[in-house]
A protein has these predicted regions:
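Positively charged n-region of N-terminal signal peptides that target proteins for export
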Residues: 1-7
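Bacterial N-terminal signal peptides
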Residues: 7-16
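Sec/Tat signal peptide C-region and signal peptidase I cleavage site
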Residues: 18-22
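Short, glycine-/small- and polar/acidic-enriched structural segments
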Residues: 23-163, 167-172, 176-184, 199-200, ...
Length: 312
């Protein structure tokens, strides 16, 4: 009888332990920016319990500085971070131990923006002007590629770090142009305050297409099975947004105070067609082509095999 009781106890403890372990996996993700419609799949997955359904507890952390999240991933202080493909190439070239494990937006959002009624009518007009930026290295890479098409160098412009203050700095004429303005956000922001902007798109001015927003992890965690659960929830959330933009906008806008405004409403609508429907898939050639571009422009020192830093 005692043997049966002991066996029963062991089985019961095993079941209880298994349930406890299966309850939740905690995941911390550093955002690239303050919460905005670019993060809609994460917000919807959170609000509709898609993360919870796959056994995840996800904490989203907004950065004090948009340059910080990749460094925190490299240091093992974040599980994931939202970053940018161009920035990833540069960081890997510098030896940062990070790898792309998924994609949020697979097409460019970034743009070079000036005031529509201002003196800058062409990229060639930027010579001797001030250009604001927020993310070092990455945005300089895009700007460099755009300038070179018009026989200009980075030394022909004055770069000013304006952190999150892109549109305000441009409107206040603290700078003549900003690189890093998202075409789905800053252009709407400027239009709302009746100071419309003119955008120059990198992919139309000498820069190869690239994935704007990606998920990165530490190379040591590139095959973490928890990420598969995360992307399963993200994919479900993305499809839900595409299929039901009206109710998902309501969920997004009520996630916290300050999101339910005209700017976010416009940006939400403009961002919908840009979310990738298969977050773990990616085009190898997109990474190869962009790597060659950066090497040609002297922004990275060497070509690194894509498979080492971009998990297919």
């Amino acid at each position: 009888m005692q043997i049966i009781f002991k066996i029963f106890t062991i089985i019961l403890l095993t079941i209880i332990t298994g349930i406890a372990n299966a309850k939740t996996n905690k995941l911390t993700i550093g955002l690239d920016w303050f919460i905005n419609p670019d993060h809609a799949p994460l917000i919807i997955a959170q609000k509709r319990n898609f993360f919870k359904d796959v056994g995840l507890e996800v904490e989203m952390i907004e950065p004090a500085d948009p340059n910080d999240p990749p460094k925190l991933v490299a240091a093992g202080k974040l599980d994931l971070a939202i970053s940018y493909q161009p920035q990833l190439h540069i960081q890997v070239d510098q030896g940062l131990p990070v790898v792309r494990v998924g994609t949020l937006v697979s097409v460019p959002l970034n743009s070079l923006v000036v005031l529509k009624d201002g003196p800058i009518k062409s990229i060639a007009d930027l010579k001797g002007k001030k250009v604001g930026f927020s993310v070092g290295g990455f945005e300089e890479a895009l700007l460099s590629g755009m300038l070179q098409k018009y026989n200009l160098q980075m030394t022909d412009v004055e770069l000013i770090n304006i952190n999150f203050s892109l549109s305000p700095s441009l409107i206040a004429k603290k700078v003549d142009a900003v690189i890093g303005a998202f075409r789905n956000f800053e252009l709407n922001q400027m239009d709302i305050v009746k100071r419309p902007g003119r955008a120059f798109y990198p992919e139309e001015h000498g820069v190869p297409s690239y994935e704007e927003l990606i998920y990165i992890a530490n190379v040591k965690n590139r095959n973490n099975p928890v990420f598969n659960k995360f992307f399963k929830a993200i994919q479900k959330a993305t499809l839900t947004i595409i299929n039901d933009p009206k109710s998902t906008w309501k969920d997004f806008s009520t996630y916290r105070k300050g999101l339910d405004d005209e700017l976010n409403k416009r940006a939400f609508k403009d961002t919908l067609p840009r979310f990738t429907l298969r977050p773990q898939a990616h085009d190898l050639n997109t990474y190869k082509d962009f790597g060659y571009f950066l090497k040609e422009k002297g922004i990275i020192k060497k070509i690194i095999k894509v498979e080492t830093f971009a998990k297919p």
